[in-house]
Amino acid sequence: PPRQFIEIYGLQDELTPDVPIDEITILQQGEISFVPSAEGEDAPKVMKWNDDVIIKQLISYAVGCMMGRYRLDKPGLHIAHPEPTAEEIAPYSYHGRKYEIDDDGILPLMNSDCGFSDNAPLRMADFVRIVFGEETQVENLNYMEQCLGKTLEQYFVKDFWKDHKKMYQN
């Protein structure tokens, strides 16, 4: 923990392990909120995870993986330029399962009856299967939909693009 590092390096006069939440640079996009404690108004507020925000971030990351921007098996950006090579967009293995980057860079955000095999809701279900396993796929998809308050299909068709753009605007 931070306190131990401060002591090991003799930085007690320079640093404190106590950091106000508003100075933490992660978790600043609505992932958490502070709510009154059950102990009353005078008690310290309790940190609450906003699962809907976290699920929306997971979906945006998953779409990034589908498009090749990120890879499941490597940290950082993968394809960050307009002309990827065949090697960069080649399928790869993750947890022993084959993962494919979208071949044309277009993910339809449409209802399931649209006829496109790379439709975003279908790709999302496959992403969940590959990342978290087939055994828990239905449970995980149900949880995601519960957090969103709608089906993945409804989310992709109606809200994904708006939420995704908002996430990356400064």
Task: Show which residues each predicted segment covers.
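Terminal accessory regions of large proteins
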Residues: 3-6, 14-170
